[in-house]
Amino acid sequence: MGRAIAITTRHGSVDAWRADPLDGAQRGALVIVQEIFGVNEHMRTVVERYAAEGYVAVAPDMFAPVQPHVELDYGEDGFARGRELASALGFERAVDIVAATAAQLREEGHATAAVGFCWGGSVAYLANTRLGLPAVSYYGARTVPFLDEPLRAPMLFHFGADDASIPEADIQAHRERQPDATVHVYEGAGHAFNRDVDPRHHHPASASLAHRRTLKFLEVALA
């Protein structure tokens, strides 16, 4: 069961959703970086699923410096507002919030990685290049402008082959410009294929395979 906590950041106190393994057997810690829709019920569930796999998982309220406690729906209005909030926050502040969250987890003695989804996938990538965190990026569509930043830790990318927001040329750019990263592409999957509360986007087979690959990656990266 998750609970609300607070993270002290350079941009003020940021609320977060945290879940810990019930059996106390901890594999490490994860900063879960939200989609543009906020730390909503789906993201809280993601946090709790990783806790069930043995990880201390924390999803900070990334938009808190702009508008705290955002939970948007998946319609056009929610998408538009989420893009506005992501733009207003900017990547610099986003990385700062991840840094503060990771620092708190490391102070507790946990080896820490970042796992991000959609916009959060691009933030997770920057947490690798700028903070040195092992990272997993699910369909991060805003990573291409930053691909010349060198990786500082293991990196895993998941992309849907049918994701209109991330064309094949962009996926190939990830392979070519970050050859040390692992890139997986899922046939039949589009954007947000892990979002199981959204039947328009969820692709169960791809989500299941990506999750298994993520767990294997984290097992090695946080060893």
What are these model-predicted stretches?
Residues 1-223:
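N-terminal cap/leader regions of alpha/beta-hydrolase-fold enzymes
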